Amino acid sequence: MIINMSKIGRNDKCHCGSGFKYKKCCLIKDDRRDMLKKRIKNISRKDFISGPYKKCPKCDENTFGVFLHTSGNRYRRECTNCWHAQSYKFPPLKKKIIYLDQFVISNINKTLDPDSSSHKKALEEPFWLEVYKKIDTLSKQNLIVCPDSSFHTDESLLCGDPSYESLKEVYEHLSHGCTFYDHNTITRFQLQQHLANYMAGDPTKHLDLNAEHVIHGHPHEWTGKMRIGVSMRPYEGQLESIHKERKSHYEGLKSVFERWQKEKERDFMDWVKEEAYAFGEGTIKSHIAHLKKRAELPHKYAEQYLTGKEPEINLEDLFPPPSSQIIESMTIEMHRHNLRGESALKKMAEYLRSKYIIDIPIIHISSLLYGALARKAAHGQKSYPNMGTVTDVNAISSLLPYSDAIFIDNPMAALLNERPLKKEIARYNTKIFSLNTKEEFLKYLDEIQTTATPEHLAIVEDSYGDTKPSFNLLKNKKQSKEDDRYTI
């Protein structure tokens, strides 16, 4: 049904069928829609040119602005008067990579969002506003980058207040299009590299922990003036899957914690080695279980069809688990060495059960952390680790080696500061901060600021202009979201 909107009076019934008067229902929405349509219709090239403006070398008008760029090693100026254009090259960059734990993102969000129920409480801690100011400014000056991760996504989805969309806006704003690969992918990448060294007869060779190999995006490129994001809702069953996995991990940790409490005579390194070597056995058992389940599926589905039942298809049964992906990547390495069939399987089993498996950074760090938890349990700790402990261990073990600094919660930072963890973790040259060392973190950020040369800052000023922190980040997001509702 097509309605002539011009014939609807303010006091007429609304065209949407709600039964309310037009002025009380869709009038504002329709006016905003018309305004946005006109704005879109009138978009021109000038809309993609912004300040800082300076005098054009051709027409002498102060209309020589910066053309919109997303990222890369060049930027372009164009004159909105005579359309003269010039291209400029950015110098190479080496930014500091800083990983911020989810609770940092959450507190920054509460500080910036006046509508948050925790806004006033967050402002009682001046640190959150101060740290955001420094991080946002350094990010805009292309001195640091704070990649987001799947841990941020999952934790944000589970959070009710602040909302997922609001948290996502904060961590994507600070990440500038850089996202760490997920925990399982990083595990597989490290194992592939370590296995190659093992097969080459050099299992103790240090891995190349280049952050660019485990980050989507380009952490050491100049960031763009425009950030492109995708607004995605959780897929069906995603929240349930995250809850189920967290609960399973927590129950497993509680069970092993109770065992640790009884192991009062064990040495710290016994627990560390136990955790490390459990990775290989766990990978093998998980892969075998997947193969058995896959082999049973045709019979299961056929039986359901023949008995007139609708097949219960579980996607988790169809897609290979992380353990099977690891075995598949190991098989490829075996083929490079002309090993196939039984000989390849024996070699893979030999490797996964070898003493060298503990040298893989992600296994090394996680084993140390679980060893530290076991030691606390054996020495009398009564309370269980919290629900997020496994997530914290996974995040730290996978992302710490690729970060120049990480800001994590106090309990995890305290574990990493214990002996011998502190000495072992030192090999990764990563600075570790928490709320207990928040002043040191602010000082660290100030030190990064002092490394910026006058030439670097001049380029930033010429290509980006204002680098002041975006205090209206969430207000602008809400307005943009409101506009999106009325866009056709």
Regions from the PLM with identified roles:
Residues Q304-V393:
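Long, positively charged binding patches that form subdomain-scale interaction surfaces
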Residues K38-K46, P52, G65, K94-K96, ...:
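Extended charged low-complexity segments that act as oligomerization/scaffolding linkers
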Residues I2-G9, I43-P52, F67-R74, F90:
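Short, flexible, mixed-charge glycine/proline-rich loop motifs
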